């Protein structure tokens, strides 16, 4: 009798104990993220890779376009450019015994003569008597004759009947550039000393200065 009671009590205690269930096992291939998250991630990676490749391709294209004009220059073109750059200074060179200043070549005579003879000498050299453009050029030519203590002829004479000082190229003297000192009459020509511009007889003897234009298309030739 006592043994049966004990058995019943033990049986009830075991049946009253709650049953523990083990958690369901997860498959290794099962992901806790929704499927559209994975799809968005893959698309984002693909777009990033395409963007990087596009930037690289664009950079290569720009470099190619920049280098193309340089590669198109043939050896003949390069040689021609070198020849032009080498020849340009030679075309601007004045003849021997001539001095260059700005866009002109200047030659100071070593002898004295009348204005007409001086004009003819310059003409024989393919030049003209000096035509003074401005005060700066006047200072330059005075420095050329410094120490000679003599006046020099320029291409300026007094003409009739208009009673004007005119340059040999036909232009009228600008008094802002030169101011003539001395008596002005028929047969007067202009000479320049270290401190003034003189009116004197064209038959007087003076040294003279010839000039040639410096032009890129032609070289001053020795006379």
UniProtKB/Swiss-Prot annotation:
Tissue expression summary: Expressed in a subset of natural killer cells.
CDD domains: CLECT_NK_receptors_like
Keyword Disulfide bond: yes
Pfam family, one: Lectin_C
Chief place where the protein resides: membrane
GO molecular function, one term: carbohydrate binding
Subunit description: Homodimer; disulfide-linked. Interacts with tyrosine kinase LCK. Binds PTPN6/SHP-1 in a phosphorylation-dependent manner.
Function according to Swiss-Prot or TrEMBL: Receptor for CLEC2D/OCIL. Ligand-binding contributes to inhibition of cytotoxic natural killer (NK) cells. May mediate MHC class I-independent 'missing-self' recognition of allografts, tumor cells and virus-infected cells.
Domain comment quoted from the record: Contains 1 copy of a cytoplasmic motif that is referred to as the immunoreceptor tyrosine-based inhibitor motif (ITIM). The phosphorylated ITIM motif can bind the SH2 domain of several SH2-containing phosphatases leading to down-regulation of cell activation.
Stated name of the protein: Killer cell lectin-like receptor subfamily B member 1B allele C
Native source organism of the sequence: Rattus norvegicus (Rat)
Gene: Klrb1b
């Amino acid at each position: 009798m006592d043994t049966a009671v004990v058995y019943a009590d033990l049986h009830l205690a075991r049946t009253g104990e709650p049953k523990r269930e083990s958690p369901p096992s997860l498959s290794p291939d099962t992901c806790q993220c929704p499927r559209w998250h994975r799809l968005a991630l893959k698309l984002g990676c693909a777009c990033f890779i395409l963007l990087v490749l596009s930037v690289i391709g664009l950079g290569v294209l720009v470099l190619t376009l920049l280098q193309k004009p340089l590669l198109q220059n043939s050896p003949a073109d390069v040689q021609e450019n070198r020849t032009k750059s080498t020849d340009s200074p030679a075309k601007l060179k004045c003849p021997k015994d001539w001095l260059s200043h700005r866009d002109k070549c200047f030659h100071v005579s070593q002898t004295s003569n009348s204005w007409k003879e001086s004009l003819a000498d310059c003409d024989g050299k393919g030049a003209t008597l000096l035509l003074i453009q401005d005060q700066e050029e006047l200072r330059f030519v005075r420095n050329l004759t410094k120490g000679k203590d003599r006046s020099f002829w320029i291409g300026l004479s007094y003409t009739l009947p208009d009673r004007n000082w005119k340059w040999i190229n036909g232009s009228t003297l600008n008094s802002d550039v030169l101011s003539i000192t001395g008596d002005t009459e028929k047969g007067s020509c202009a000479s320049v000393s270290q401190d003034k511009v003189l009116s004197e007889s064209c038959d007087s003897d003076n040294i003279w200065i010839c000039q040639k234009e410096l032009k890129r298309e032609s070289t001053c030739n020795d006379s």
